[in-house]
A protein has these predicted regions:
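Von Willebrand factor
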Residues: 39-74, 86, 107
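RNase H catalytic domain
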Residues: 23-41, 45-49
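A conditional alpha-helix N-cap/helix-loop micro-motif detector
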Residues: 1, 55-59, 147
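Short hydrophobic/aromatic-rich motifs at helix boundaries and adjacent loops
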Residues: 15-18, 34-36, 61-62, 126-128, ...
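Von Willebrand factor type A / integrin I
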Residues: 65-75, 84-189
Length: 189
């Protein structure tokens, strides 16, 4: 939420409009683009108070909605953990119509599962629950390796699609990744 607020305030300082589309497997909430501090505060309030009704994630649904909503070329920031599939076409279309910036949110447990003993893990996307013995070193190493492969493949795929991708970790400051992104953009233009 904080990084979205920073980006929104930065945009209004630049005189730009800011909007919000919150989604799960459906579009949950839309705040149409407007200018002004009061509008950004409304967006922040919506981010804090949203109660999602959907169970999964459909990036395609959200991007298709954004493409219908925005008539003019805009900067679109997609903040997600990208635990979805089948979104390439929607991202490509959005990237062609707009300036798409993917903000990949990653949790420390996705980097390294801690030794916490027996865990009951619930996947809200698939509605599945599994028991995992996190004190098993081989299992932790295997899971860590698979997650690293998945993240590396995603990052390479974004490069292949020529899309901007900012990786932000929930347990670390977002300042460095944002600054690095803006410096790369400045050197490009």
């Amino acid at each position: 939420i904080e990084i979205c607020a920073v980006l929104a305030f930065s945009a209004i300082q630049n005189g730009d409009k800011v909007g919000l589309v919150l989604f799960s497997d459906v579009v949950e909430k839309v705040v149409p683009p407007k200018k002004g501090k009061k509008h950004v505060l409304r967006i922040i309030r919506e981010l804090y108070t949203i109660k999602a009704t959907g169970k999964g994630t459909s990036i395609s649904t959200a991007m298709n909605y954004v493409n219908r909503l925005l008539n003019r070329r805009s900067i679109v920031v997609l903040a997600s953990d990208f635990q979805d599939t089948e979104y390439d076409t929607a991202l490509k279309i959005t990237n062609q119509k707009h300036d798409l910036v993917n903000l990949s949110i990653r949790h420390p447990f996705e980097e390294e599962l801690p030794d916490l003993g027996l865990l009951s893990l619930y996947n809200a996307e698939t509605n599945e629950q599994v028991m995992v013995d996190s004190s098993n070193k081989r299992l932790r190493a295997h899971l860590q390796s698979k997650l690293k492969e998945k993240h590396d493949a995603f990052d390479k795929h974004m490069v292949k699609l020529q899309m901007d991708n900012i990786v932000v970790h929930t347990d670390k400051s977002y300042i460095r990744p944002l600054m690095s992104f803006f410096q790369r953009r400045l050197s490009r233009y």
